[in-house]
Regions:
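Mature extracytoplasmic enzyme cores
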Residues: 1-226, 233-234
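Beta-sheet entry/capping signal
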Residues: 36-38, 51, 114-117, 169-178, ...
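Phenylalanine-focused residue identity feature
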Residues: 87, 144, 153, 195, ...
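Extended amphipathic secondary-structure runs
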Residues: 101-108, 118-121, 239-255
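Generic recognition of stable, solvent-exposed alpha-helical segments in well-folded globular domains
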Residues: 144-152, 170, 186, 190, ...
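Generic, well-ordered alpha-helical scaffold segments in large soluble proteins
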Residues: 152-159, 163, 174, 178, ...
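Short, Lys/Arg-enriched charge-dense amphipathic segments
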Residues: 188-203, 244, 277-289
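Hydrophobic targeting/anchoring helices
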Residues: 250-318
């Protein structure tokens, strides 16, 4: 009202990846007495803003990346000062799964008060492999299950090297999985059991945090989301990359694969390369002054570090 201004927050936008199509949520401390906001962006290159939404709700900073919906650098530092009343009390979360019928109709006598109902389900990612000929194109397999790896191997390499395949009899000695271009995955059929086995506590009570809500407090939510991303990393590593390595070696093939973790999918890039006979990355140099193709655009250095860690050769596809 008196015409004065004050800075609410200043930060560097997290580094993202080339398949990131998710919004970015930035949290700030509670503020009062403000009716006009000014948002300034200093960017090296031209950048368009599709939509800007201001909200009074408490959300986790950059939760889209924290929850594994996309891969970005994570924001660390002091948590915003927000009223605890805006956080979700875990003790007040009610599981209504048994109150919903098979058609998705909810029958529930809600206690007095204001309630937010989260209807959570899962479908496939909507991604298909490519580039590929029409007869070789289909839905991406489940990367968090051994069955997914087995199905992908059997449907492609297995046909080539099988008794009726054109490469039967030892004609093929290796296989390469190219760059990961199927965005991210966040669920599998037995995700709750897998999470509890790896993290040591039930998942369901914390599901709201995967959608940006602050459960209990910022620090506790951050710790849960760390366990969540670790589960995603472990499942993709052991079920898919480990499964593909098992299938390859069982058929006398060496396995090379390019980056997924540190490129598109959140995960431990040093961990999953243990299943590569040849860890690979890719690089190119764009003719214009752009981040695309630069040394940090692809995780080249972590790939080389993984090769040194496991004492194996590193490959490059350029």
């Amino acid at each position: 009202p008196d015409g004065s201004t004050r800075k609410i927050r200043s930060l560097q936008i997290p580094q993202s990846n080339w398949q990131d199509e998710s919004p970015i949520s930035l949290a700030c401390s509670d503020i009062d007495g403000v009716n006009t906001y000014r948002i300034s962006i200093n960017n090296r290159h031209t950048m368009g803003i599709g939509r800007l939404r201001l909200s009074s709700a408490a959300v986790k900073d950059n939760w889209e990346a924290e929850a594994g919906w996309t891969l970005r650098s994570l924001i660390r530092g002091q948590h915003p000062e927000q009223a605890k009343e805006a956080f979700i009390d875990p003790a007040r979360i009610i599981d209504l799964s048994d109150a919903m019928d098979t058609k998705g109709n909810l029958s529930w006598n809600a206690p007095e008060g204001n309630w937010t109902i989260l209807r959570i389900g899962h479908v496939n990612t909507g991604m298909k492999n490519g580039p590929a000929p029409a007869e070789g194109t289909g839905w991406e397999c489940d990367k968090f299950s051994s069955e997914g790896a087995d199905a992908q191997f059997a449907g492609y390499i297995g046909r080539l090297i099988g008794p009726n395949g054109p490469l039967y009899g030892g004609m093929l000695d290796g296989m390469l999985m190219d760059s990961w271009e199927c965005k991210t995955q966040t669920w599998t059929a037995n995700m709750e059991q897998e999470f509890e086995q790896l993290a040591g506590y039930p998942l369901r009570q914390w599901l709201p945090a995967i959608f940006g809500y602050v459960v209990k407090d910022h620090e506790t939510t951050t710790r849960f989301l760390r366990d969540w991303r670790a589960t995603i990393s472990s499942l993709a590593t052991e079920k898919f990359f480990g499964g593909m390595a098992h299938n390859a070696h069982a058929n006398g093939l060496t396995l090379a694969f390019e980056t997924a973790f540190g490129d598109i999918l959140p995960g431990d890039i040093l961990e999953y390369y243990k299943y590569a006979d040849v860890p690979m990355c890719e690089f190119w140099r764009h003719p214009s002054d752009t981040f695309v193709g630069s040394i940090n655009f692809k995780p080249i250095k972590p790939t080389a570090s993984a090769a040194r860690l496991y004492g194996i050769l590193v490959g490059n596809f350029a």
